[in-house]
Structure formats: structure tokens, C-alpha cells
Swiss-Prot record:
One of its GO terms (cellular component) is chloroplast. GO terms for biological process: lipid metabolic process. Keywords: Chloroplast, Hydrolase, Lipid metabolism, Plastid, Transit peptide. Belongs to the 4-hydroxybenzoyl-CoA thioesterase family. The active site is at D97. Its main location: plastid. Residues 1-56 form a transit peptide. It is found in: Plastid, Chloroplast. Its EC number is 3.1.2.-. This is Acyl-acyl carrier protein thioesterase TE1, chloroplastic. InterPro entries: 4-hydroxybenzoyl-CoA_TE (IPR050563), HotDog_dom_sf (IPR029069). Mostly expressed at low levels in glandular trichomes (lupulin glands), and, to a lower extent, in stems, leaves, flowers and cones. Acyl-ACP thioesterase involved in the production of fatty acids and beta-keto fatty acids. May play a role in cuticular wax synthesis. The lineage of its organism: Eukaryota, Viridiplantae, Streptophyta, Embryophyta, Tracheophyta.
Amino acid sequence: MLQTISLLPAYNKPPVATLLHPHRSSSSSPLPCGHVSPVTHGGLIMNPQKRLRSFSANMKCSSTNSIIDDTIIRNGQRIMMSEYFDVQLKVRDYELDQYGVVNNAAYASYCQHGCIELMESIGVSGDRISRTGDALAISELSIKFLSPLRGGDKFVMKVRYCRISAVRTYFEHKIFKLPNREPILEAKATTIWLNKKYRPTRMPLEITSLLDKFFTR
């Protein structure tokens, strides 16, 4: 089942139309492995510090397009892919399990939060999506756990677009613990555009134009 993404800030009530109502995960009732739970936009950190920076990535997104180093060939044009969007977060106590480490389900929320911040940075906000009457959903999420996070840990979520198509957008995620940048996680996510009937549909032209500008700048 597809998991819709809430792009609304926590202090706004989500509309009744297309976006799923967000809920905050609780350490008292941890979710099963692999479950992607909807989260509030601000539920992970009150003041995320975000910026764009260059980062040499080893993980490549599987694609039918040609990939050379950190570039991708799309429509005959070479597009740089080394630019990650950074969001700095801090582990909250309610995200821990009985062993004192971050519950595995919380990492899916971190990845979702990174996607939200990246999309809003290029102008794809919840308001813009809701005006179309459509919704954005996660159809696939693959996570590779490298090391655990614990209560009070500060970390940086690095997210970038890997590839886009008419219906789907592909993301790559990396998490590093601060300040020593210890690798914590690598993940790949696929989002899909849905119409009013929750059927896959083509992205509106205004949205694809914004994504293309991000790729080709």
C-alpha cells in the first residue's frame, strides 16, 4: 500500500482532501521493521538547519540512464548529481526503543523529513500540491543500517534527487552522526504522483519544471 507524504507544517491542520493526516511515532509502541509511518512535518526537530553542499557519493541509483561518476545522462544532457541537501536533526527520546537506540521505524521518518525539506527548498510545498488536487506518496523505501543512533545524538540527513520520470521521483539518503560524521544509514526512496482517485498519474508541468531546474542548474 502506498504511503502518502504530508508536506504540511505541524502548526497547520492538514486538509481533508488528499494528504494523509500525520501522526507522531511513539517509543511506547514501536512500529514493525520496514513500516513507513506518516510523521508531522515538525515532529523530528523544531529548527532544522538545512543547506545545499557538494558531497562525493559512492551510492548510485539504479537506472536505465547512463551514469558516469556523479553525473547522469538524461535526454542527451549531462547533469551533475553531486549536490546533496543537508538537514541537521537531533534524536528525541520518544524515538528510542527498549534497547536505548533509535527505533528502526524512526529512520524512515527521517528519510521522509529529508524529502519534504528538499522539495520545499525548490518550491514544491504542500499548498502547491494540494492546489492540484493530487497527492505524493512513497511507493518504495530501501534502507541499509550501518550504525545506531542514541538519545541526544545530533546527525545530518543528506538527501538528493537521483532520477525523475513522468510519474516517479527517486531519492538517495545518507545519515552521518555529528560531529565526527560517522556513517549511520544509506537509503533509496521512490515517490509517486497520485490523482484524486489515488491512481498513479503524470506530474503537473509546473512541478516537473521545478525539478528540471534543480537538476540542470
